[in-house]
Amino acid sequence: MSCRERTDSSCGCNGHEENRILKCVVVGDGAVGKTCLLMSYANDAFPEEYVPTVFDHYAVTVTVGGKQHLLGLYDTAGQEDYNQLRPLSYPNTDVFLICFSVVNPASYHNVQEEWVPELKDCMPHVPYVLIGTQIDLRDDPKTLARLLYMKEKPLTYEHGVKLAKAIGAQCYLECSALTQKGLKAVFDEAILTIFHPKKKKKGCLGCHGCCAII
């Protein structure tokens, strides 16, 4: 397990929360960039070497409302071979990040077909945030050529907002683990969701910046 200190967000907490160990679990199809997402955030650098299917549990010290908390980041494998083992990492989760790649339409559809049903079955009361990954590939020529060959296109921000509303996600955010664009906002939102989950009456759409960064 790796651990490093990070001052992430001031979420308007009332100051009476006891120091907590926070648990954030990332789920989604294989090859959508979950591991790189976590490693890039935890290490503040994109992994240049081979990335295993599941990386080690990382812990990051975050400051919320003037109090320090330990944020545990948990990777999961999206392949079907892990369907029986994956839920073993779910107990005591405070927030889930459901990931899909904006250049992998199948991973987008599987959010509603596979991942939300699994979470509702295993952890029905835990909030989740929808994350679009690999946004740096939206303009990548090789990626665009591959999608064109399959008669597909990259998914837009509007696609993510629509899906977030449909599944009752707390919020939709996009990021790139490679460039780190939007990366910190993803985990700021995860922390905010733990302390101040929103009711799912209409969902929370486009919540960029709803956490004050310090």
UniProtKB/Swiss-Prot annotation:
GO biological process, one term: angiogenesis
Coiled-coil portions: none
Matches recorded under Pfam families: Ras
GO molecular function, one term: GTP binding
Residue ranges annotated as motif Effector region: 50-58
Post-translational modification note: Palmitoylated; regulates localization to the plasma membrane and may be mediated by GLUL.
Lipidation sites (S-palmitoyl cysteine): C3, C11
SUPFAM superfamilies given in the database record: P-loop containing nucleoside triphosphate hydrolases
Keyword terms, alphabetized: Angiogenesis, Cell membrane, GTP-binding, Lipoprotein, Membrane, Methylation, Nucleotide-binding, Palmitate, Prenylation
Binding residues annotated for GTP, in chain numbering: 31-36, 46-53, 75-79, 133-136, 177-178
Disulfide bonding pattern of the chain: none
Compartments where found: Cell membrane
Positions of S-farnesyl cysteine lipidation: C211
Tissue: Highly expressed in heart with moderate levels in lung and liver. Very low levels detected in brain, spleen, skeletal muscle, kidney and testis.
Residues the record lists as Cysteine methyl ester modifications: C211
Propeptide segments, given as residue ranges: 212-214
Record function comment: Plasma membrane-associated small GTPase specifically involved in angiogenesis. Required for endothelial cell migration during vascular development via its interaction with GLUL. Elicits the formation of F-actin-rich structures, thereby regulating endothelial cell migration.
Protein family per UniProt: Belongs to the small GTPase superfamily. Rho family.
Quaternary assembly: Interacts with the CRIB domains of proteins such as Pak1 and Was/Wasp. Interacts with GLUL.
Protein name, UniProt field: Rho-related GTP-binding protein RhoJ
Organism of this sequence: Mus musculus (Mouse)
